[in-house]
């Protein structure tokens, strides 16, 4: 029986990255594409509970897709329970245009949020992201994003093939894959842990023509991190693979908390 794969992202169903992701798994089984109709970066694992959702079926570059009027997590939920009507064997979220590394992105990335939603149903999940060297590229029209995805496609294909055959190791719900911008066929692969920080958060205040203030959440990237982290791997030009668990319980002796009670 052919494997069933659900493909989603957070950059939107028309983004170049999801077409590359489709190429990475199209030979591994039946691929269902269910992704946001609009750009949804930074929404994390949010779901729409105060408005109805609509599905638009269309074809993009010969690929049948389902454009969801909601978040990446909405897209996974509708993909499983309305479109496929069964659990897939694998969920792939990506390729995100922009790296998703450090604890900063685990809770804010729609790419990772969608993968975590699938993982919550016991489905092995992969999130795949591509580093960009200019931050502004993340905010451009990603339909026409130009990049050679071939190395990333080949790498994700190999990982997905093995996950479909063997599943994920115990206590691993998601593999967070980040591909460096200048990746090569022989680029080193590192199994990494999450760096603590990647962004130095700030707020920029501006004034509208009437003199009233408005604000942009901004900040700079942090380019230094401990050895063994995803940020460090990407800075070295290595492919980063971080195993993620849904269980966010701190691995400490609970007696250390008792004095706070």
Swiss-Prot record:
InterPro entries reported in the protein's UniProt record: SurE, SurE-like_Pase/nucleotidase, SurE-like_sf
Family listed: Belongs to the SurE nucleotidase family.
Superkingdom of source: Archaea
Catalytic activity: a ribonucleoside 5'-phosphate + H2O = a ribonucleoside + phosphate
Keywords: Cytoplasm, Hydrolase, Metal-binding, Nucleotide-binding
Root EC class: hydrolase
Cofactor binding annotation: Binds 1 divalent metal cation per subunit.
Summary of the function given for this chain in its UniProt record: Nucleotidase that shows phosphatase activity on nucleoside 5'-monophosphates.
One term under GO cellular component: cytoplasm
Subcellular compartments: Cytoplasm
Residues bound to a divalent metal cation: 10-11, 41, 96
Database matches in Pfam families: SurE
Enzyme Commission code(s) on record: 3.1.3.5
Known cofactor(s): a divalent metal cation
Protein's UniProt name: 5'-nucleotidase SurE
Family annotation (PANTHER family): 5'-NUCLEOTIDASE SURE, PHOSPHATASE, PUTATIVE (AFU_ORTHOLOGUE AFUA_4G01070)-RELATED
Regions annotated as coiled coil: none
Taxonomic source organism: Methanococcoides burtonii (strain DSM 6242 / NBRC 107633 / OCM 468 / ACE-M)
GO MF: 5'-nucleotidase activity; metal ion binding; nucleotide binding
């Amino acid at each position: 029986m052919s494997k069933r794969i659900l493909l989603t992202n957070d950059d939107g169903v028309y983004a170049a990255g999801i077409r590359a992701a489709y190429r990475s798994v199209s030979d591994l089984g039946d691929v269902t594409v269910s992704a946001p109709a609009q750009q949804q970066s930074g929404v994390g694992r949010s779901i729409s509970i105060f408005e109805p959702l609509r599905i638009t079926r269309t074809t993009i570059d010969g690929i049948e897709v389902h454009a969801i009027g909601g978040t990446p997590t909405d897209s996974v939920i509708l993909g499983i329970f309305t479109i496929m009507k069964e659990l897939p064997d694998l969920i792939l979220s990506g390729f995100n245009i922009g790296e998703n590394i450090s604890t900063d992105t685990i809770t804010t990335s729609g790419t990772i949020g969608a993968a975590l939603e699938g993982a919550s149903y016991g489905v092995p999940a992969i999130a795949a992201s591509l580093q960009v060297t200019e931050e502004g590229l993340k905010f451009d029209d990603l339909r026409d994003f130009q990049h050679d995805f071939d190395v990333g496609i080949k790498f994700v294909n190999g990982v997905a093939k093995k996950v479909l055959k063997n599943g994920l190791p115990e206590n691993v719900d998601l593999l967070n894959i980040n591909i460096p911008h200048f990746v090569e066929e022989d680029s080193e692969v590192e199994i990494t842990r999450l760096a603590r920080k990647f962004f130095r958060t700030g707020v920029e205040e501006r004034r509208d023509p009437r003199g009233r203030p408005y604000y942009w959440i901004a900040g700079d990237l942090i380019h230094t991190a401990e050895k063994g982290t995803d940020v460090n791997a990407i800075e070295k030009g290595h492919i980063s693979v971080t195993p993620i668990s849904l269980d966010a319980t701190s691995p400490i002796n609970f007696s250390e908390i008792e004095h706070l009670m």
